[in-house]
C-alpha cells in the first residue's frame, strides 16, 4: 500500500523512510497546525484504516529505588520523591496475573509491566519476570516489559517466554540528554534496542516532552526514532508529569497543542507504528486528546494509574473513545 504524504496541499506518494534529517522533521513539526493535522490524517487513514485504538494496561511490579538519576522520575533514589515497595516474589507473580486478567476483562489488548531497575540481573527476580510474561501471554494478551538494560541472553530468554515488546525509551534528543540523565548514556540505550530487536522482540520506544527541551530537540528525538529500520512497533509520546521532589518539579504543564504536534509528526514519520498517547494525558483535557486521536494516536494506556502517576479511569476513557468515534477491544468484551 502506498502511503500518501501531503506537501503544500498536494498529494505525493512516499514509502517508509529511514533517512530523515532533523531539519526536515523540524519543518513538519512547525507547520501550521491545520496543515499538519490534515497531513497526519491522510497518512493515518491510509496506513491504519478502521480507527481502532489499542488499549494497553500498565502495572508497576517493582517500584522505586532505581539507581538511575532521571530528572523526571519519582522512582529515582537520587530524588527526594523516591518511592519503594517490593512484595514477595510468589505473591507478586499471582498478583500480576490477577491484574492482567482484570485488565483483559476490562478490554485491554496489551499488558505492560515495569521494574524500576537500571538493568535486569539474573536470579529469582528475572525468573519471576519470565513467569509473568508467560502467564500474561497464556491469557491471550500481548506482553510488554520495561526494566532497563539487558544482555543478549536475557533478551533471548524473554523472547522464548513469549514477550511481545520491550519498552526502552530514548526520553529526549541526543543533544539534550545529558541535561536529564547522567547515569546511562544515549549509546547504551541504542545498544539495548539493538539487543531487543536481535532477539526478535518488537520495540516500544518513544520519549517525553515538557522537560525544558527546545523544538529542535523534539525534532531530533523524532528523527532518531524515525531512522530506526524498521520503525519501532510502538512509539509512546509522553508529556512530563512534574512530580514534587524531582528536579523538574517546577516546570509548567505541557501545552496540549504541543502534544498534538508531536503525535501528528510521529504519525507522518512512522506511518505504521502504534503511536501511543502515554503519560500526561490527564493534563490534556478531552478536546486535545480527541485531536491527538485525529492526528494519529492509535493506542492509549488504559486504567486509572501508570507507574507512579494517575491516568483517566476506565469509564472516562470509554466515554472519550465513544465521543471520538474510534473503536477498541472493550466494545467486543462487553457484548
Curated annotation (Swiss-Prot):
Catalyzes the conversion of dethiobiotin (DTB) to biotin by the insertion of a sulfur atom into dethiobiotin via a radical-based mechanism. This is Biotin synthase. SUPFAM superfamilies: Radical SAM enzymes. Its EC number is 2.8.1.6. Pfam families: BATS, Radical_SAM. The gene is bioB. Binds 1 [4Fe-4S] cluster. The cluster is coordinated with 3 cysteines and an exchangeable S-adenosyl-L-methionine. Keywords: 2Fe-2S, 4Fe-4S, Biotin biosynthesis, Iron, Iron-sulfur, Metal-binding, S-adenosyl-L-methionine, Transferase. Belongs to the radical SAM superfamily. Biotin synthase family. One of its GO terms (biological process) is biotin biosynthetic process. Residues 51-281 form the Radical SAM core domain.
